[in-house]
Amino acid sequence: MPGQVAGTRDRRDSRWDEHRRERREQLVQATLTAVSKHGAGVGMDEIAAEAGTSKTVVYRHFADRAELYVAVCTRVAAQLLPKLRDAMDSGGSPRGMVAAAIDTYLTFIEGDPELYRFVVDQQTLDRPTTDPLTSLSDLVGAQVAAAITVALQQAGADPSPAAPWGHGVVGMVRAAADWWLRADRPMPRSALAAHLTDLAWAGLSGVVSTKEDK
């Protein structure tokens, strides 16, 4: 009998945990929709209204706005990273891989600038949190570094600079993308992507490119 009671309790706990996970995902999706409707400065009342509930219910699932913010950023990173990987995989040459990654990142920003602003701007949070793009930038930097490593090895060159170069490219692109958005996109995305690719490749081509890439 005690075993049956424990088993019933475990099943109830499992169902409740699953319900909580599903409800959190629904609230994250509601936040994304609310950001699209109301902009990066969306309030918790607007998020709750989009979810068809109250702020009290939202705070049952997220301790504060910062926790919800981190969950949204995690969702954004999970959606963006596979696109970046696919773009790099289809890039072909090392230069093509760098160009594809840069354009994919800028396409994300251009497609939903308010969501990007929501992700990078923490001024509306009730407590500070870590930069949500740091982990994503680290992952992307590692991907770029891996591509550079292969190219260096193929060229018979020392692969040790690949990591700082890969992360340096990502940092440059992020800084330029932030400027582009703040300046109200003074040039087309394609032009910015081409300029950044040219600048990045000017530093890399001497040691990683083939004659066809130069």
Where are these regions (language model features)?
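Basic, helix-initiating cap at the start of DNA-binding domains
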Residues: 1-50, 67-70
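Short secondary-structure transition hinges
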Residues: 100, 107-146, 156-161, 186, ...
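Hydrophobic alpha-helical connector segments
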Residues: 71, 86-114, 166-169, 193
